[in-house]
């Protein structure tokens, strides 16, 4: 599950972006 947001841990927007890309959850 941690194979995308390892380099985007510096911004909040980036984290939610990668999470949506790696795990398409119905938010």
Curated annotation (Swiss-Prot):
GO terms for biological process: nitrogen fixation; phosphorelay signal transduction system. It comes from the Bacteria. GO terms for cellular component: cytoplasm. One of its GO terms (molecular function) is ATP binding. It is found in: Cytoplasm. The keyword Glycoprotein does not apply. Keywords: Activator, ATP-binding, Cytoplasm, DNA-binding, Nitrogen fixation, Nucleotide-binding, Phosphoprotein, Repressor, Transcription, Transcription regulation, Two-component regulatory system. Phosphorylated and dephosphorylated by NtrB. The keyword Lipid biosynthesis does not apply. Its main location: cytoplasm. Member of the two-component regulatory system NtrB/NtrC, which controls expression of the nitrogen-regulated (ntr) genes in response to nitrogen limitation. Phosphorylated NtrC binds directly to DNA and stimulates the formation of open promoter-sigma54-RNA polymerase complexes. This is DNA-binding transcriptional regulator NtrC. It comes from Vibrio alginolyticus.
């Amino acid at each position: 599950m941690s194979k995308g947001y390892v380099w985007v841990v510096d911004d909040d927007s980036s984290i939610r972006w990668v999470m949506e890309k790696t795990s398409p959850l119905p938010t």
